[in-house]
């Protein structure tokens, strides 16, 4: 074997090792001191914390800085008007900082072993006394799934199912690809996803846990939840890994259906 071929082989092996076992944390860029299938240091994996706020909607668990948007029963305007579509929401953290970077590694860079870490996060916020008959992952349109190679919500659903002993049922179907939701109001988002989902089987009387990775306004998840209810589901809860923090954003009254001030 010539020296050139040997050097090329060594370079290829080193490149493969660095790819599989990178020497820097992909979140903080600090040197990795342990060999792991997850290219993230233990400190960054432990950094995300459950969402905290002074006030929450009792139904969708949206965080607020004051009681102003909540009625006497503790519900926000969207839940009071039945615009969310689901019966309860459980979410782990805020979609920013380290948690956002971890989700990007999982979702866009294919670091699938993170699903076990995320399963631990979700287990912290899902009440053990709740009973579910099936866990349903939020479906991707087939083109998006083909491009990404996997459905991140499906991986999260499988991890929760493994921990809870509840079956995964892939009964939600995305009928059409929807335009990007970024920059749209909640009302526009709801219109954007109207009729985008369908249930593939009857769910009469079932309590469903719908699993998604990130909750923004809830328009997409709400549309899917309504499709499951049209198929007979008695109760649909949403479990999300992260939600965008909207506490300091006072929303447009007409678009968001918040109560007007006197």
What are these regions (language model features)?
Residues 1-212, 216-262:
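Glycine-rich phosphate/pyrophosphate-handling loop used in enzymes and phosphotransfer proteins
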């Amino acid at each position: 074997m010539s020296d050139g071929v040997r050097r090329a082989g060594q370079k290829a092996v080193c490149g493969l090792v660095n790819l599989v076992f990178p020497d820097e944390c992909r979140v903080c860029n600090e040197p990795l001191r342990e060999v792991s299938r997850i290219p993230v240091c233990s400190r960054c994996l432990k950094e995300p914390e459950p969402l905290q706020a002074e006030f929450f909607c009792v139904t969708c668990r949206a965080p607020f800085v004051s009681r102003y948007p909540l009625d006497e029963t503790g519900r926000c305007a969207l839940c009071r008007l039945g615009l969310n579509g689901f019966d309860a929401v459980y979410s782990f953290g805020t979609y920013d900082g380290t948690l956002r970077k971890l989700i990007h590694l999982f979702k866009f860079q294919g670091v699938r072993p993170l699903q076990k870490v995320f399963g631990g996060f979700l287990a912290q916020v899902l009440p053990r006394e709740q009973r579910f008959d099936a866990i349903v992952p939020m479906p991707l349109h087939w083109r998006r799934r083909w491009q990404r190679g996997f459905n991140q919500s499906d991986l999260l659903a499988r991890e929760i199912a493994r921990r809870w002993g509840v079956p995964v049922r892939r009964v939600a179907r995305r009928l059409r690809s929807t335009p990007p939701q970024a920059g749209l109001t909640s009302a526009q988002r709801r219109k954007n996803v109207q009729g985008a989902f369908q249930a593939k089987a009857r769910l009469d009387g079932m309590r469903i846990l719908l699993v998604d990775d990130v909750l923004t306004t809830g328009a997409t998840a709400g549309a899917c939840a309504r499709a499951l209810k049209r198929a007979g589901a008695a109760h649909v809860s949403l479990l999300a890994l992260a939600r965008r923090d909207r506490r300091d954003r006072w929303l447009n009254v007409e678009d968001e259906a918040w109560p007007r001030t006197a």
